[in-house]
């Protein structure tokens, strides 16, 4: 495939084709990925999101990589659902440091009926602040998905994690088909999809290819594809797993960019472990989204000022979205906070 040829969006990738991409010489692969990237995106713009854990710990799932699983002793304190106003305050702070999307994550197998009203209020409030909204709450029913869409949720994150073949080695409490069903519900409800996976769990190159095939062969590509590098947490079964080779990680980003040319490819968890040179290679490979702030749910993330310093050195600017004038935006913040303060949901969220 010529690096400069026009790229058509495909949904029929085969393992042999994706293997061939992975097996290219490193420079050829990066050149092809960067060429594809430039056909659809400004190469010097990166979308910036902030992630907040709105409910931490004691998750009933047994994901072997996750410090929030109740199956493992990782020293993580269990926390109740965060109050709506605190979520809105965190969103306003994220906005102030340059984030355009606010992502809220809860350590649940699925949201309960009693939690949904608070979650919906969070979505509505963050939207009023002028931010895009994203949530990751676990498995959803069709009714819950529709309610989130009606509240104004822009993105729903539900990662596939790895290939179907390797998946059973990592998670036994939820099936791969259940994950795909949730993604189908999200798409049917008219929301955008954020879905990717994790590298460094002991998977093979074919498993990495298999993950990308599952994502790229969906009826519509995910708008956002987070590629995570395993953050090894003491107490989890993967705490002693071998490190991912940095070049293998960059290769996966590049292949994701080629296969899903119009998606934002997010350099996600594990960035704290990457030096500036590796992050620069990631942007060259087509990564054009990051999480911004000091924490990703429960693990460290590069500090915001370090990110902006690196952006400046590389000539990168945060991706912009249409904004209200400052005074209109400030009024929206104040109004949203007042509405949440006056709501019964505001008072009861923490004890629900």
Swiss-Prot record:
Organism: Ectopseudomonas mendocina (strain ymp) (Pseudomonas mendocina)
Keyword S-adenosyl-L-methionine: yes
Pfam families (alphabetical): BATS, Radical_SAM
Name the record gives this protein: Biotin synthase
InterPro entries recorded: Aldolase_TIM, BATS_dom, Biotin_synth/BioAB, Biotin_synthase, Elp3/MiaA/NifB-like_rSAM, rSAM
Residues where [4Fe-4S] cluster binds: 59, 63, 66
Entry binding sites for [2Fe-2S] cluster: 103, 134, 194, 266
Cofactor note: Binds 1 [4Fe-4S] cluster. The cluster is coordinated with 3 cysteines and an exchangeable S-adenosyl-L-methionine.
Sorted UniProt keywords: 2Fe-2S, 4Fe-4S, Biotin biosynthesis, Iron, Iron-sulfur, Metal-binding, S-adenosyl-L-methionine, Transferase
One GO-annotated biological process of the protein: biotin biosynthetic process
Every Radical SAM core domain range: 44-262
Enzyme Commission (EC) number: 2.8.1.6
NCBIfam families per record: bioB (TIGR00433)
Function: Catalyzes the conversion of dethiobiotin (DTB) to biotin by the insertion of a sulfur atom into dethiobiotin via a radical-based mechanism.
Record note on quaternary structure: Homodimer.
Catalytic activity from the UniProt record: (4R,5S)-dethiobiotin + (sulfur carrier)-SH + 2 reduced [2Fe-2S]-[ferredoxin] + 2 S-adenosyl-L-methionine = (sulfur carrier)-H + biotin + 2 5'-deoxyadenosine + 2 L-methionine + 2 oxidized [2Fe-2S]-[ferredoxin]
Family membership noted in the UniProt record: Belongs to the radical SAM superfamily. Biotin synthase family.
An example Gene Ontology molecular-function term: 4 iron, 4 sulfur cluster binding
Pathway in which the depicted protein is active: Cofactor biosynthesis; biotin biosynthesis; biotin from 7,8-diaminononanoate: step 2/2
């Amino acid at each position: 495939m010529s690096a400069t040829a026009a790229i058509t969006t495909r949904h029929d990738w085969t393992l042999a084709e994706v293997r061939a991409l992975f097996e290219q010489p490193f420079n050829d692969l990066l050149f092809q990925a960067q060429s594809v990237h430039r056909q659809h995106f400004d190469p010097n713009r990166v979308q910036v999101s902030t992630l907040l854990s709105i409910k931490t710990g004691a998750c009933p799932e047994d994901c072997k990589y996750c410090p929030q699983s109740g199956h493992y002793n990782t020293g993580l304190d269990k926390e109740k659902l965060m109050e709506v106003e605190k979520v809105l305050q965190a969103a306003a702070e994220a906005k102030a440091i340059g984030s355009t999307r606010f992502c809220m994550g809860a350590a649940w197998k699925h949201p309960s009926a009693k939690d949904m009203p608070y979650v919906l209020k969070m979505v509505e409030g963050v939207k009023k602040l002028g931010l895009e909204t994203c949530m990751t709450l676990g498995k959803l029913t069709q009714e819950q998905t529709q309610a989130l869409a009606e509240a104004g949720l822009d993105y729903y994150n539900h990662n596939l994690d790895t290939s179907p073949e390797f998946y059973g080695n990592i998670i036994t409490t939820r099936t791969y088909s259940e994950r795909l069903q949730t993604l189908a519900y999200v798409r049917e409800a008219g929301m955008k999809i954020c879905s990717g996976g994790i590298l460094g769990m002991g998977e093979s190159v074919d498993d990495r290819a298999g993950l990308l095939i599952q994502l790229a062969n969906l009826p519509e590509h995910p708008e956002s594809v987070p590629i995570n590098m395993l953050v090894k947490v003491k107490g989890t079964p993967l705490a002693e797993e071998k490190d991912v080779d940095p070049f293998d990680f960059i290769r996966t980003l590049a292949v994701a960019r080629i296969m899903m040319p119009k998606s934002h490819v997010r350099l996600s968890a594990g960035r704290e472990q990457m030096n500036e040179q590796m992050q620069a290679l990631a942007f060259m490979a087509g990564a054009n989204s990051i999480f911004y702030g000091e924490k990703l749910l429960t693990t460290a993330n590069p500090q915001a000022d370090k990110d902006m310093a690196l952006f400046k050195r590389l000539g990168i600017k945060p991706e912009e979205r249409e904004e209200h004038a400052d005074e209109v935006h400030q009024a929206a913040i104040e109004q949203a906070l007042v509405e949440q303060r006056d709501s019964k949901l505001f008072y009861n969220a923490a004890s629900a």
